[in-house]
Design a protein with these regions (language model features):
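Lipolytic serine-hydrolase domain surface
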Residues: 1-54, 74-257
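Gly/Ala-rich beta-loop-alpha elbow adjacent to hydrolase catalytic centers
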Residues: 59-68
Length: 257
């Protein structure tokens, strides 16, 4: 197994630049990415008749999903899976659904295209909505039904069998860095709560989808809040989220609900 971090194109400048609202850089980058992906397959195939073609899995974030969508449509050789997280939107006029991408299909005939968008990601929607401010209807969110991808959660939760906790994604970043409670958290993910951070639900699921094991994704028990005392001896689940493994007793209580 090998991991290639592909940075072979000009990505948009950060705000206040409006480049992220355009698809021009994504189209140009998509052409280059398609050539790279096809090159991996063809190079491996030319080495020996006894060597099987590589199993390629594409993982893309933010504007990279826009770029990857153009690449995947242009491919000559299908990849095994594609995973989009925190997407800046897909150009629906050119890519009508996940089925338009050259990605392998599961036994039921559905493309192995996985999508996730965290509810606390406030940046990705800006790219999608903002792309429509340039005089025409803009890009659409691949997490919505029109795209036909396989959606999975980034909200965190507890494994229903073991009680193990998986943290939520709390922002747009692949790797969280912001201090909890600071002004940075309006848009940035807090430390340990980025899409690819260890022990997050999103990071765990992306590890599965990008190694051909997306069928093993579980639906988790939603994260609980600590209970705070209220009037009349009552308590209410309004405290911080409990991001630790559940005790056997707590897990049994959740399983019985």
């Amino acid at each position: 197994m090998a991991v290639v971090s592909w940075i072979g194109y000009d990505s948009p400048e950060e705000p206040p630049s409006a480049e992220v609202l355009s698809t021009e850089l994504a189209k140009a980058g998509g052409t280059k990415l398609a050539a790279a992906l096809d090159g991996f397959t063809e190079t491996r195939a030319s080495e020996s008749v006894d060597v099987s073609p590589p199993s390629l899995n594409v993982v893309a974030h933010s504007y990279g999903t826009t770029t990857a969508s153009y690449a995947l449509k242009a491919l000559k050789h299908a990849v095994a899976t594609a995973t989009f997280f925190g997407s800046a939107g897909i150009e629906w006029r050119e890519i009508g659904s996940a089925a338009d991408l050259h990605v392998a299909k599961d036994p039921a005939g559905k493309p192995e295209v996985y999508v996730t968008a965290a509810s606390e990601d406030r940046v990705a929607p800006l790219g999608i909505v903002g792309s429509g401010l340039r005089g025409r209807e803009g890009r659409w969110d691949p997490a919505d039904d029109w795209f036909g991808g396989k959606n999975f959660s980034s909200e965190g939760g507890y494994d229903p069998d073991t009680g193990k906790v998986y943290k939520r994604t709390a922002g747009h970043d692949a790797k969280g860095w912001a201090v909890d409670g600071s002004g940075d958290t309006v848009f940035a993910a807090t430390t340990g709560h980025g899409y690819l951070d260890p022990d997050t639900e999103s990071g765990h699921n992306i590890a599965l989808t990008s190694t051909g094991r997306g069928h093993l994704i579980k639906e988790l028990i939603p994260l609980r809040h600590e209970e705070k005392p209220g009037y009349g001896g009552m308590s209410f689940p309004t405290g911080p989220l409990i991001e630790r493994d559940l005790t056997p007793e707590e897990l049994a209580e959740e399983q019985s609900r």
